[in-house]
Amino acid sequence: MRYDVIIIGAGPGGIFSAYELTKQAPDLKVAVFEAGHELKRRKCPIDGTKIKSCVGCDSCSVMSGFGGAGAFSDGKYNITNDFGGSLYEYIGKNEAIDLMKYVDDINMEYGGEGTKLYSTAGTRFKTVCLQNRLHLLDASVRHLGTDINYIVLENLYAYLQDKVEFYFDTPIQTVETVSYTHLRAHETLMNL
């Protein structure tokens, strides 16, 4: 297998990297290797009745697979430099916010339209916090909700699946340098 770009992991970083490559350099041959399952196969066996605790699956569907650990979350996306990461330290605060808004636009395009964008800036709650010597960090937060978050991921996968080669259930163990311009990824194929 030879690819121009190999992405390890199909969490948000991997998904949006693949997305951007399909838009900016559609002629590149791109592969995404993911230790977990594709989205539709991600199911945790814990049902609360027969199975009440973790059974130690080879690939934890809660934590890994297409969409990453947040695939089944309530779909809150923070648009802020005040917490949650340090991207702004590398590219600047305005550029970081612009990228976060760009990702938000993509989420809206792929199924999140109509969801609410909340903000703490200029709210009565912020005023009350300040009056009581509490510092409320400013943020805009897009709340997709669990169901819409899943739909956005389904739609992104539908867009990507014909443009990128996905290898699910394929954890990468090591990456070695072959030459100045080439790397080799070593995989462990899981028998499922």
Write out the residue ranges for each language-model feature:
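Beta1/beta-strand and adjacent pyrophosphate-binding region of the FAD-binding site
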Residues: 2-11, 31
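N-terminal Rossmann-fold NAD(P) dinucleotide-binding loop
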Residues: 14
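A conserved short coil-to-beta-strand element within the FAD-binding core of flavoproteins
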Residues: 168-179
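Aromatic pocket-lining residues of Rossmann-like dinucleotide-binding sites
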Residues: 21
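Conserved small/polar residues in nucleotide/adenosyl-binding loops
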Residues: 181-188
